[in-house]
Amino acid sequence: MFQRKRSVSFGGYGWIDKTMLASLKMKKQELLSSADVTLPERPLSPPLTAPPTMKSAEFFEMLEKMQAPKLEDQKAGSQKHKEDYIPYPSIDEILEKGSPYPLVILPQFGGYWIEDPENLGTPTSSDSSVCEEEEENFSPSPYGYKLECKGEARAYRKHFLGKDHLNFYCTASSLGNLILSIKCEEVDGTEYLRIILRSKVKTLHERIPLAGFSKLPSIPQIAKAFCDDASGLKFNPVLYPKASQMIVAYDEHEVNNTFKFGVIYQKFRQTQEEELFGNNEESAAFRNFLNLLGDTITLQDFKGFRGGLDVSHGQTGVESVYTVFRDREIMFHVSTKLPFTEGDTQQLQRKRHIGNDIVAIIFQEENTPFVPDMIASNFLHAYIVVQVENPDADTTSYKVSVTAREDVPSFGPPLPSPPVFQKSPEFREFLLTKLINAENACCKSDKFAKLEDRTRAALLDNLHDELHGHTQTMLGLGPEEDKLENGGHGGFLESFKRAIRVRSHSMETMVGSQRKQHGGGIPGSLSGGIAHNSGEVTKTTFSPPVSAATAKNQSRSPIKRRSGLFPRLHTGLESQVDSRARCDSISGPQKTPDVGHSSQEMKSETSSNPSSPEICPNKDRPFVKLKENGRSNISRSSSSTSSFSSTAGESETLEEYDSVGSQPSTASPFKQDVFIYSASPGSDSPSVGAAATPVIMSRSPTDIKNRNSPRSNLKFRFDKLSHGSSSTSH
């Protein structure tokens, strides 16, 4: 007898064998004991019922093995990183050693350089990206200290403006938009070619001699000589009288004639940012130093360069220090003159202005070291530390040290050895020149250079577009005649516009050819055709006999046609009789227009559905006689719905046709069909005479006679053609 094996239920509802229970206990004990065994002795793949302690232990050991190489690399990297900066002691270690202290010490993790004749870490002059050029428009220094500025920024004003020269622009090159200025000049009997090439990366200014050239080089050759990537470019001349003013404005956008510098007062053994900004009292030595820098002015209603200070409501203090140095305005943000806020340890009102400066002066009244990273700021890149010596004596001197971030190039004038200055106008000249050159050099650091590159590229593109637009206007060309050069393209929108223009031109060409072939119109069998006017109108000629039901129809009053999207359907015997009577009413001869008969003619309301029209019940096969190029006996309905229209005469039909043609034409997107019914001469019934068979004629959806209809018009014509037997009956 088959016996079902008992199953183990973990829910507690099934029977459990004693033998199975014992085996489970043994396995559990083995697994628990295996947790104390070393990793190599453990099973490679623990069972699913392994205890959590075993699984978690193996999991964390596996993670440690996987992360071991990364941790070793990180440790090695951190050791190398620390080894690079081990020689730089902290400020606390310097203070423990006792005086004399250096003016500046490098941060523990580096990132700054110190300009000092004895310091080997000072960058050489070759690392500087600025050039020294004394400008003619500024007053010279009596002590020979030169202001460092970019010579390319003022070269156009100095050498090109107001003199004969040519300007060219290049569109959409591999280097972006380019603008080139060229000028011939002669110095000491030697001809030179002075060139300025502007790109989104930088501006190049060179002067090359023409002694070895038999003829002047072309503009693409000059651009190729400046940059190897500038090959195969096409330059266009700038034809605009005011182009020089626009170009000089672009070149001098980097020139700055207003500066603002911070001045921070550091007392003895102050090593924290909060301590520096918390000083409110000014010593006599500090006031004398401020008087050396400039004049103390009242901010209220101040008319000069305010440097971001409030000159209307006094929210940034009452006084400040201001000076004009070599035609440049300088405003100093003095920490002790900015508003002090009680309870604010960070003194954000003071740090808000000084922290946004690029260069700051640290004035030390006593011998105390300064660390550049002592002040947390993203903008401060250079510090000039000034320490006063013998402040109360007549021979007061100042010891100077300069520090800046590593990505800031060196700037002049260089410090003398030893870097000590007597209190004199020369020291003021040196200090102000050093401050201005320091800010110009800081603009070449990585952070500020990226901002400057984006600004330069945007301004260059704007200048190029303006010069191109003014040149096209001077030539009398519009935007449609603009052509992109050097493989440039206008993006998806311009490509789409060009495709649409090409398609429109091809459609117009097709329409013109169709008009020539078909006498000015496209056949109605072509669906989706172009709107056109056709002089040939297809009409049905008929000569119906006079029926006995005409008198009955004339006695009825005319029925007004009902317009609508779904016409009313006539059902029942009465509608059939009326329809038969209307069919008989048109059987009389209508060769000449009859006004009286037209006034009594009934224009029946439509009595059919477009899918199942109601027609006269005739069984014989009809025939249709078409007459071309004629307007007689035409019946048209101007209603937008499917309707029956009886023909009263030629004058009425022509008037109705003209009214339809004079209506505003709106193209219908649907193909329109016209159903024409004609009667055959063979008839079994004397009253009706012939059966009606539909003839479908397709018309263009843009036909001028149907363009006022929002949908397809079904026009039914009931024609009877007389024959010999019917004419003898009259």
Curated annotation (Swiss-Prot):
Residues 631-651 have a biased composition (Low complexity). Residues 617-630 have a biased composition (Basic and acidic residues). SUPFAM superfamilies: Rap/Ran-GAP. Residues 247-463 form the Rap-GAP domain. This is Rap1 GTPase-activating protein 2. The keyword Nucleotidyltransferase does not apply. The gene is RAP1GAP2. GO terms for biological process: regulation of small GTPase mediated signal transduction. Residues 510-668, 698-730 are annotated as: Disordered. GTPase activator for the nuclear Ras-related regulatory protein RAP-1A (KREV-1), converting it to the putatively inactive GDP-bound state. The keyword Manganese does not apply. The lineage of its organism: Eukaryota, Metazoa, Chordata, Craniata, Vertebrata. Residues 535-557, 597-612, 699-712 have a biased composition (Polar residues).
